Amino acid sequence: GIFSLIKGAAQLIGKTVAKEAGKTGLELMACKVTKQC
């Protein structure tokens, strides 16, 4: 029903946000390590 639809959308959004946050975090760490911030 509608609940599984919302749950599926929430999971998809969560995964996307986590992926973007992870990418941003890695870039931040890399620029700190190489001192190019």
From Swiss-Prot:
Family per similarity comment: Belongs to the frog skin active peptide (FSAP) family. Esculentin subfamily.
Keywords for this protein: Amphibian defense peptide, Antibiotic, Antimicrobial, Disulfide bond, Secreted
Highest taxon of source: Eukaryota
Lineage: Eukaryota, Metazoa, Chordata, Craniata, Vertebrata
Annotated tissue distribution: Expressed by the skin glands.
Biological process per Gene Ontology, one example term: defense response to bacterium
UniProt main location, coarse: secreted
GO CC terms, sorted: extracellular region
Protein name: Esculentin-2HSa
Function: Has antibacterial activity against the Gram-positive bacterium S.aureus ATCC 25923 (MIC=32 uM) and the Gram-negative bacterium E.coli ATCC 25726 (MIC=16 uM).
Disulfide bonds: C31-C37
Xref: InterPro entries: Antimicrobial_frog_2
Compartments, record wording: Secreted
